[in-house]
């Protein structure tokens, strides 16, 4: 599979309003202070943990790891272009919060189990793992037909992943996060062109072009919908 480069590249996911709401959600679920140590697995450009650093004023910058590097990475984090398992096996740090946002579905089942078991060993006593993924039951993402079919197949797999995680040896709480998106159709089709979501990564240029034509026909000039996520909060 191609790497996911544009999920936080000038999208609502990288907007100040989204990041503020997301970080407020995190802080309502997990108390953090200046001494907290943070890790973001699949951090993208690191805007979320970079904003969290400025808000809390951590003594140590959060660490973000991703297999894709960008020129516009947030300066308020330490970025490592590395596989998550490799990093966790090498580091001597323990973390108060490990964030895995809309990344877990990209892994094979055995990789998920291995990753979470290592993450557990790297938690502080009160540390927590936050796993975010699209809500498979109430998804409102605007789509064209082929995209919809691919997303539905992906969400079916997500349900299986959730069931698997719930069987692992963790204390687990399930929460929901929702953000109301208000975006122009022109901006959204540009995001589709840039393949902002993993579902689109293997689509051909022709499939993307046809899909955009379908979006232009089906939807109004302004798209308003809820971006809904399931959040699994794991602790020892």
What are these regions (language model features)?
Residues 102-103:
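Short catalytic micro-motifs in class I SAM-dependent methyltransferases
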Residues 154-169:
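Short alpha-helix
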Residues 173-236:
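Conserved Class I S-adenosyl-L-methionine
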